[in-house]
From Swiss-Prot:
Extracellular topological segments: 97-111, 196-213, 265-283, 341-354
Protein origin, superkingdom: Eukaryota
Residue intervals annotated with topology Cytoplasmic: 1-75, 133-174, 235-243, 305-319
GO biological process: oogenesis; response to steroid hormone
Membrane topology: Multi-pass membrane protein
Species: Sus scrofa
GO terms for cellular component: plasma membrane
Protein name stated in the entry: Membrane progestin receptor beta
Length: 354
């Protein structure tokens, strides 16, 4: 018996040694990549306030930037937070489909499908922007414009499910006529404001750039969250027992926390150079926004399952299809805006190089 135990302990020890060597094995298996560089070795466009090091050098092959997913640099946490969140959304939705037997062809399901699509879209576009933007100046602008398109798509996807699944009757009777058109416009305005701010202002960025980003996005959030906020407030005033309402509450709280870290460069402002790889504000923003999305998804799945009678009483299939068609119209408008400003950037960079 003692011999068997010692053999097992020996096996565990060997396994532990292999696990400790796993990061080194993975690193050795990847192509040899350039190391990161300090801020003085990259153009001004790529520098972030109070982030002194951990930048990837520009001008390398695309392969390098894709494989930098496994390299230690100042964007890698931003990439992984949204990559893991996208996988979590997919897995949670798939588990719901397997459990509930989702009727794919039903009009009742369409807003939910578009919401999940919009969530995956914004998370994917965001991680691609942070992963690939260091390739060149044009790539930097291009991928961040794509990121902003993803944000507008997610905003409207959220508006759809809040409107169809989460709103209570008192709010619905007052705002149903103009809510979705206004949400679509605010989604496009948010994309336009972010793209224009990126195009118009250069580092070091003035305060006006943040205003162009935050104000349209803030208006979109206030509008999109209004059906949820109204329902949550009434629920808590009456001694809330709804599980979905608690998830919606968490969604709001996590979003507000993420918005703070997006707007303010903390904690790196107080510890310049100490938060280069892990711990700077944009990473915290990504983490809380990911948790916000997962809380929102959980709330919407509960609403989808538990409020079907309310949904079917309010909405005809035709009105649902019309509302969901506007989703693709918003995608087209936001994409066209981003493409137009990208062409302007491309012309400006060409003139600069000539």
């Amino acid at each position: 018996m003692t011999t068997a135990i010692l053999q097992r302990l020996s096996t565990l020890s060997v396994s532990g040694q292999h696990l400790r060597r796993l990061p080194k094995i993975l690193e050795d298996g990847l192509p040899k990549m350039p190391g990161t560089v300090p801020e003085t070795d990259v153009p001004q466009l790529f520098r972030e306030p109070y982030i002194r090091a951990g930048y990837r050098p520009i001008g390398h092959e695309w392969r390098y930037y894709f494989f930098s997913l496994f390299q230690k640099h100042n964007e890698v946490v931003n990439v992984w937070t949204h990559l893991l969140a996208a996988l979590a959304v997919l897995l949670r939705f798939w588990a719901f489909v397997e459990t509930e037997g989702l009727p794919w062809t039903s009009a009742h399901t369409l807003p939910l499908l578009l919401y999940v699509l919009s969530s995956i879209t914004y998370l994917t576009f965001s991680l691609l922007a942070h992963l690939l933007q260091s390739k060149s100046e044009l790539s930097h602008y291009t991928f961040y414009f794509v990121d902003y398109v993803g944000v507008s798509v997610y905003q409207y996807g959220s508006a759809l499910v809040h409107f169809f699944y989460a709103s209570d009757q008192a709010w619905y009777e007052r705002f149903w006529l103009f809510f979705l058109p206004a949400a679509a416009f605010c989604g496009w305005l948010s994309c336009t404001g972010c793209c224009y701010a990126k195009y118009r202002y250069r580092r070091p960025y003035p305060v006006m750039r943040k205003v162009c980003q935050v104000v349209p996005a803030g208006l979109a959030f206030i509008l999109d969250i209004s059906p949820v906020a109204h329902r949550v407030a009434l629920c808590h005033l009456s001694g809330c027992q709804e599980q979905a309402a608690w998830y919606h509450t968490l969604q709001i709280v996590f979003f507000l926390v993420s918005a703070y870290f997006f707007s303010c460069p903390v904690p790196e402002k107080y510890f310049p150079g100490s938060c280069d790889i892990v711990g700077h504000g944009h990473q915290i923003f990504h983490a809380f926004l990911s948790i916000c999305t997962l809380s929102q998804l959980e709330a919407i799945l509960l609403d989808y399952k538990g409020r079907q009678e309310i949904f079917l009483h309010r909405h005809s299939p035709l009105s649902i299809y019309a509302a969901c068609l506007s989703f693709f119209f918003l995608v087209a408008c936001s994409g066209a805006t981003a493409a137009l400003l990208r062409e302007k950037i491309k012309a400006r960079l060409s003139k600069k190089d000539s």
